[in-house]
């Protein structure tokens, strides 16, 4: 059964593309972007857990 790990990170204005590309280059897939509790954007990512 495939297992996933998740991470959240704030998206800084005017640096969204760089942040998304950085996480994507490490194998993270963007799941969703939402407004955070303090008004900024928060990105949710997932990727398969590596077999140990």
Regions found by a protein language model. Give the residues of each.
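Terminus-proximal functional modules
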Residues: 1-52
């Amino acid at each position: 059964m495939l297992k996933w790990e998740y991470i959240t990170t704030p998206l800084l204005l005017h640096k969204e593309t760089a942040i998304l590309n950085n996480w994507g280059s490490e194998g993270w897939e963007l799941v969703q972007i939402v407004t955070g509790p303090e008004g900024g954007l928060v990105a949710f990512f997932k990727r398969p857990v590596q077999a140990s």
